From Swiss-Prot:
Keyword Ribonucleoprotein included in the entry's annotation: yes
GO BP: translation
The entry's keywords: Ribonucleoprotein, Ribosomal protein
Protein name per UniProt: Large ribosomal subunit protein bL36
Family listed: Belongs to the bacterial ribosomal protein bL36 family.
Length: 37
């Protein structure tokens, strides 16, 4: 899980999801998981 000021899609499988006011990236590639912090 990467914590970043700006989350970006890293590949075509990445999806940007908003959960409880937190922006996250979910992907089939575990290294692409990100959270805005």
């Amino acid at each position: 899980m990467k914590v970043r000021a700006s989350v970006k899609k890293l590949c075509r499988n990445c999806k940007i999801v908003r959960r409880n006011g937190v922006v996250r990236v979910i992907c089939v590639e575990p290294r692409h998981k990100q959270r805005q912090g």
